[in-house]
Curated annotation (Swiss-Prot):
<dbReference type="InterPro" id="IPR037914">
    <property type="entry name" value="SpoVT-AbrB_sf"/>
</dbReference>
<keyword id="KW-0805">Transcription regulation</keyword>
<dbReference type="InterPro" id="IPR035642">
    <property type="entry name" value="MraZ_N"/>
</dbReference>
<dbReference type="GO" id="GO:0000976">
    <property type="term" value="F:transcription cis-regulatory region binding"/>
</dbReference>
<dbReference type="Pfam" id="PF02381">
    <property type="entry name" value="MraZ"/>
</dbReference>
<keyword id="KW-0804">Transcription</keyword>
<protein>
    <recommendedName>
        <fullName>Transcriptional regulator MraZ</fullName>
    </recommendedName>
</protein>
<dbReference type="GO" id="GO:0005737">
    <property type="term" value="C:cytoplasm"/>
</dbReference>
<dbReference type="GO" id="GO:0009295">
    <property type="term" value="C:nucleoid"/>
</dbReference>
<comment type="similarity">
    <text>Belongs to the MraZ family.</text>
</comment>
<dbReference type="InterPro" id="IPR035644">
    <property type="entry name" value="MraZ_C"/>
</dbReference>
<keyword id="KW-0238">DNA-binding</keyword>
<dbReference type="InterPro" id="IPR007159">
    <property type="entry name" value="SpoVT-AbrB_dom"/>
</dbReference>
<dbReference type="InterPro" id="IPR020603">
    <property type="entry name" value="MraZ_dom"/>
</dbReference>
<keyword id="KW-0963">Cytoplasm</keyword>
<feature type="domain" description="SpoVT-AbrB 2">
    <location>
        <begin position="80"/>
        <end position="123"/>
    </location>
</feature>
<dbReference type="GO" id="GO:0003700">
    <property type="term" value="F:DNA-binding transcription factor activity"/>
</dbReference>
């Protein structure tokens, strides 16, 4: 499982150094290839390549006659790129994806089970503050019987 939050700095070339705790797991379980894509304007998704393939298949299976779904396919699949982790555990994030999501220097790498989300660190702090301010009664209604 991929979990935890790491605040990292991109180097001057736009490379992200995957933290050692994740690098070892990724290399042993999934190999050195990752797939990065855009899901929204505020963050990127970063999948180990084997975890991306079923997501890609589900996206390709969506009905293409629906204009909204077609736009979503175009957004996610059209921006998907395979990255190779170098010997130092770094991946080069495509410049266009960095621009679209305002990833410049400080970023938050957020483990989400089968993938990472990659946020501008300031935006991540804002998202975290918003999450902490969620109305607990409203959240309980949505969670039903689920507890931690």
């Amino acid at each position: 499982m991929i979990g935890g939050v790491s605040i990292l700095s991109l180097d001057s070339k736009g490379r992200l150094a995957i933290p050692a705790k994740h690098r070892e797991t990724l290399l042993s379980a999934f190999g050195h290839k990752l797939v990065v894509t855009l899901e929204s304007q505020d963050h990127l998704l970063l999948y180990p390549e084997p975890n991306w393939r079923p997501v890609e298949a589900r996206l390709l299976a969506l009905p293409t006659g629906n204009p909204t779904l077609k736009r979503y396919q175009r957004l996610v699949l059209g921006h998907a790129e395979t990255l190779e982790m170098d010997s130092a555990g770094r991946v080069l994030l495509p410049a266009r994806l960095r621009e679209l999501t305002a990833l410049d220097k400080d970023v938050a790498l957020v483990g989400m089970g089968n993938r990472f989300e990659l946020w501008n660190a300031e935006e991540w702090d804002s998202q975290t503050a918003d999450a902490l301010a969620i109305d607990q009664a409203d959240l309980a209604q949505h969670l039903g019987d689920f507890t931690l």
